[in-house]
């Protein structure tokens, strides 16, 4: 199996895996492994490509665009999770110590005359 065939199978399996698996730490680890393997395979590709290899490369490039979109979706979901965690942390500390963030600006309004 040559490098383009390996790249083809790796990309195809990664696309199906990233689309069908919910976000998790394991998925992120697999994405890192995929990117490392993929970069090695791309470095080993030698350039006069046959017609079949060109077709495979075109398909790999279209799949790559889909993988990038899925990775952007994962990035957005991770960012929203982080924002939610920060909000929960702020609400939790506010609940534990409600008088912590009171500002004292020296203003006192007397209602009596």
Curated annotation (Swiss-Prot):
Major place of residence: cytoplasm
Tagged with keyword Coiled coil: yes
Keywords: Bacterial flagellum biogenesis, Chaperone, Coiled coil, Cytoplasm
Magnesium listed as a keyword: no
Highest taxon of the lineage: Bacteria
Residue ranges that the Swiss-Prot or TrEMBL entry lists as coiled coil: 25-90
GO biological process, one term: bacterial-type flagellum organization
A GO cellular component entry from the record: cytosol
Quaternary structure annotation from Swiss-Prot or TrEMBL: Homodimer.
Homology family: Belongs to the bacillales FliT family.
Function of the molecule: May act as an export chaperone for the filament capping protein FliD.
Name of the protein in its database record: Flagellar protein FliT
Lineage: Bacteria, Bacillati, Bacillota, Bacilli, Bacillales
